[in-house]
Regions:
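Cytosolic regulatory regions of ion transport systems
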Residues: 9-385
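Single conserved hydrophobic/aromatic residue that forms the stacking wall/gate
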Residues: 2-6, 10
């Protein structure tokens, strides 16, 4: 009771005058107002910073990353294959710079690629031909760079502009960085090689697809073989140094790999698959092998034993004339016909059926030696046709 009476007396004596209470009330309201304004400013600043980060304009701090310049339908496939290739790396990164919204790129990769495992995918919005935008993605620290050909008219001109900005700008790309550029027209290969100064590997997409299309249509099951070799699931091609094979012939080196298959050599920047068996290997040569992983490429100099009497010699069988039906038409039709002409026997025929205008003008100028070409306009989805 004593403490209750004492505290009530103290509280009643501290009430103060009405003026004092008014000042305290105004101070409290002012404090609440200032704190509210401060919270609003902090919230607005954080939201602005997050909004700026969503725009994809911040600098990329990754090192040793794979840099993709441009956006095309092939991006999802490229990222998927790189994710598989980087499974043995702890901190792998893929950086994409394209004139697309960052959120849209992130959503597209998440939808089509899914789990990227140990690989981090970073998207940035910008033009690959703009030096300021290129600086954002740290090209000097990249392990490899892929320049994609965009959709639309004259895509090769855009690729050349990107290479000029990349190699002739203020960025110093190290020689160890492997640069791959996608080109569609064979006439533009020489300008790209001139700009690349020996540092750019040109992939002639249209010609490559045409070759694979012709070869797979002529041999059943070959598409499965190409799929096995060209993706990172299973076995694929690898280049490796093997100085211990110096002085051996290619035929002798075939038996020096236990868990991979030797298929060619790389000398002075040129790759030759299936060289002569008596070709002598040099210490600075690189071997081209088919292996499950680069860690399985190991040389074993112990000579294997086998019965040479069981080896069979094949005889060449003459190829008869063929008839090929091509349904549809696109910009690769002429390339496919030329590639087909190089494989078939004399007297072979090819019929192109497509529902396009001026088909005779489009195909009339294709120069063929062994193949007799004819065309017909019609709806390829019609059963009556």
């Amino acid at each position: 009771r004593y403490w209750r009476d004492w505290s009530s007396d103290v509280c009643s004596s501290d009430l103060g005058s009405r003026a004092y209470l008014a000042i305290m009330f105004a101070t409290t309201l002012g404090g609440i107002f200032v704190v509210s304004v401060l919270i609003g400013l902090l919230t607005s600043g954080i939201q602005d910073k997050l909004r700026e980060l969503r725009k994809g304009k911040s600098f990329v701090v990754e090192e040793g990353h794979t840099l993709i310049l441009g956006w095309s339908p092939q991006v999802n496939t490229i990222v998927s294959e790189l994710v598989i290739a980087n499974e043995s790396l702890k901190r792998a990164a893929i950086v994409i710079l394209a004139e697309q919204d960052k959120t849209a790129m992130d959503d597209a990769i998440h939808q089509h690629v899914g789990d990227t495992k140990s690989t981090r995918v970073v998207c940035r919005t910008g033009s690959p031909i703009d030096l300021a935008h290129l600086a954002i993605v740290n090209p000097e620290g990249a392990r490899s760079i892929v320049v994609l050909s965009p959709e639309g008219p004259d895509p090769d001109a855009h690729v050349i502009k990107v290479l000029l900005a990349l190699l002739n700008g203020r960025h110093k790309i190290p020689e160890r960085c492997h640069i791959v550029a996608e080109i569609r027209d064979a006439r533009n290969v020489e300008p790209v090689e001139l700009v690349g100064r020996g540092q750019v590997e040109v992939v002639l997409v249209e010609d490559l697809i045409s070759r694979i299309t012709v070869q797979t249509c002529r041999q059943s099951g070959l598409s499965v073989v190409y799929g096995e070799l060209l993706d990172f699931a299973g076995d694929e091609f690898y280049l490796a140094r093997a100085p211990e094979l110096a002085g051996k012939t290619f035929g002798e080196a075939l038996f020096c790999f236990e868990r991979c298959a030797l298929v060619g050599i790389k000398r002075d920047g040129e790759v030759e698959l299936g060289p002569d068996f008596d070709r002598v290997l040099h210490a600075d040569d690189e071997v081209v092998v088919i292996a499950e992983d680069d860690t399985t490429v190991r040389v074993d100099l112990r000579a294997p034993s086998f019965d040479e009497a069981r080896l069979c010699r094949s005889t060449r069988v003459p190829t008869p004339p063929e008839r090929t039906l091509i349904l549809g038409y696109n910009r690769r039709a002429a390339l496919i016909l030329r590639q087909l002409d190089a494989y078939v026997a004399e007297g072979s025929e090819a019929l192109v059926v497509a529902d396009v205008d001026r088909l005779d003008e489009r195909l009339g100028g294709v120069a063929l030696e062994r193949l007799s070409l004819s065309w017909r306009r019609g709806d390829t989805t019609s059963r009556a046709l």
